[in-house]
Amino acid sequence: KHGHKGREWGAIIADPCCLGACLAPTLPVSLPAAGGLPTEFSSAQFRAALGMFATGVAIVTARGAQGQPVGLTISSFNAVSLEPALVLWSLGHTSTALGIMRQASHYAIHVLTVEQRALAERFATRGIDRWAGVAHQPGRSGAPLLAGAAAVFECRNRSQYVEGDHTIFVGEGLHCTHQPHSSPLLYHGGMFYTEHPLGRVAESALG
């Protein structure tokens, strides 16, 4: 999602196919011919509608060619596969981090807790040193790791797909950790939220 002026966010991928990873077998797909019905909404309307899909908030980190740490806030994180362990996220082509993320061999995705709201805003702000005063250490692949995240996925930069004005990154999980009782930082309609438990999901509803 995109934040307010001066903020740089990864875009949303609104994928309501299931609550877990989408594990249906791969089947041949017939795609419709190009063209079809014209678009009947503006970019602003499309963005506002996508904003109704509540997401978590994450920070992706990597290292540039000179070893410098790079990081940005995203809300496009999603599961792809359990076997192999694959995740995806997307980044707009106007992002200053795009070139580095395309070239990085590995990156780390940090799923943020409610206590990390300030960190989410910091890594979404342009024109500042996002790493000033931020403690981090190298992970197994060398990507910078931030402390306190609800979950961390260290990934190989497995594949990339250009679609429209974004690049979709598919990462292969090499290592992951999580804190099972942490409260998540959520993003919906341009505002931050946290959880309000309604009860466990029925087993029959899990994908």
Where are the regions that the model predicts?
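Basic, polyanion-binding surface patches
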Residues: 15-207
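Short hydrophobic alpha-helical segments enriched in small aliphatic residues
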Residues: 3-5
